[in-house]
Design a protein with these regions (language model features):
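N-terminal localization/anchoring segments of enzymes in phospholipid and broader phosphate metabolism
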Residues: 1-160
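A short, hydrophobic C-terminal helix/tail in secreted or cell-surface proteins
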Residues: 161-166
């Protein structure tokens, strides 16, 4: 990703510390600084979920999701119905989740089920039947990227407990 030099110039004109941080992010990590972006904080998971559902419905090109814990139930089933519909509309959908879910939340063959719907699915860090330090290296990410324009990070797991569906 290329850094927009006009953004860099504006940062140098405003505050050198910001420009230096931008330089580091761009040159050392490959993350350019942008202008005219928005961030919204969701103090309650239900608010994030409602917003994300609206944005998923708008997807036109791709939806990429990576989540730590997923369980079939109200929240995940709502998302899955949208993902299946979006695949049928020609949207590329990719989903990755942590293999710990296969322990008691999802069947081990769940990626194959999603692939039958046209969703590209991977299970990371599959459970191994022997003791290993790898099992402690879980993927706790909670990321959703829609069309490269909208993103959601953190906060919500897609389980019945998260939906307070007990």
């Amino acid at each position: 990703m290329d850094q927009d030099e006009k953004v860099t110039e504006a940062l140098w004109a405003s505050k050198s510390a910001n420009a230096q941080l931008s330089y580091y992010l761009s040159h050392q990590l490959g993350f350019p600084t942008y202008r005219n972006t928005e961030v919204e904080y969701f103090p309650v998971g239900e608010d994030k979920f409602a917003s994300m559902i609206k944005e998923l419905e708008k997807a036109e090109k791709f939806i990429f999701m990576e989540y730590f814990i997923v369980e079939e139930g109200i929240m995940w089933d709502t998302i899955l119905e949208i993902l299946k519909r979006k695949v049928n509309e020609g949207v590329e959908v990719r989903f990755m989740y942590d293999g710990m879910c296969a322990f008691d939340l999802l069947p081990y063959s769940y990626p194959k089920k999603l692939q039958k719907f046209g969703i590209k699915c991977k299970m990371s860090n599959k459970i191994r039947p022997f003791v290993s330090t790898i099992q402690n290296n879980r993927d706790h990410r909670k990321i959703c990227v829609i069309d490269g324009q909208t993103g959601y990070v953190g906060c919500l797991l897609y389980t019945s407990d998260a939906a307070d569906d007990r």
